């Protein structure tokens, strides 16, 4: 994927923890990168399960591991990279949050948060997410804020320590 994306940073983290050099080749999305991987123009790529699941299941792409600490239910038999690459602390999870303008009233935030949490619990949403290799975890807006701050710290340290910048990414 492109420069500075979560996919790029996941590969940079894996390279840093494994002590190997990887060349980042920026793409405008997963599809052209996957096409080059399938055609043999790339030797490897890091991407999301949702983007690559159909290629993996069809046998066109071989998954070596998942970036979660637990196996992904949608890809049985594919180990976590923490285990497969002998990197016990390697974990990268893609997450999405519901965001509103900062001036939004707390009452509206509460209504939206409650509705989102209820929707995420429904069997239909759970199944739809599982079908594409994803899962849902609701929570509070405060918990999302903590996650946000932790992710900024985590990835900021990687970017600063390895001197990653958009001119080099």
UniProtKB/Swiss-Prot annotation:
<protein>
    <recommendedName>
        <fullName>UPF0065 protein in clcB-clcD intergenic region</fullName>
    </recommendedName>
</protein>
<dbReference type="GO" id="GO:0042597">
    <property type="term" value="C:periplasmic space"/>
</dbReference>
<dbReference type="Pfam" id="PF03401">
    <property type="entry name" value="TctC"/>
</dbReference>
<dbReference type="InterPro" id="IPR005064">
    <property type="entry name" value="BUG"/>
</dbReference>
<keyword id="KW-0614">Plasmid</keyword>
<comment type="similarity">
    <text>Belongs to the UPF0065 (bug) family.</text>
</comment>
<keyword id="KW-0574">Periplasm</keyword>
């Amino acid at each position: 994927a492109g420069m500075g994306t979560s996919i790029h940073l996941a590969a940079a983290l894996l390279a840093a923890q494994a002590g190997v050099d990887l060349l980042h080749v920026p793409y405008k999305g997963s599809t052209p990168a996957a096409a080059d991987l399938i055609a043999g123009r790339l030797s490897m790529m890091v991407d999301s399960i949702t983007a690559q699941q159909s290629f993996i299941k069809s046998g066109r792409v071989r998954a070596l591991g998942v970036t979660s600490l637990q196996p992904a239910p949608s890809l049985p038999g594919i180990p976590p990279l923490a285990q497969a690459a002998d990197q016990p602390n390697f974990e990268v999870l893609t997450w999405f949050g519901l965001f509103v303008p900062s001036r939004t009233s707390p009452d509206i935030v509460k209504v939206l948060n409650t509705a989102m949490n209820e929707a995420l619990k429904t069997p239909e949403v759970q199944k739809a997410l599982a079908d594409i290799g994803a899962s849902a975890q609701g929570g509070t807006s405060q918990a999302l804020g903590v996650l946000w701050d932790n992710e900024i710290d985590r990835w900021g340290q990687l970017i600063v320590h390895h001197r990653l910048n958009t001119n080099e990414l």
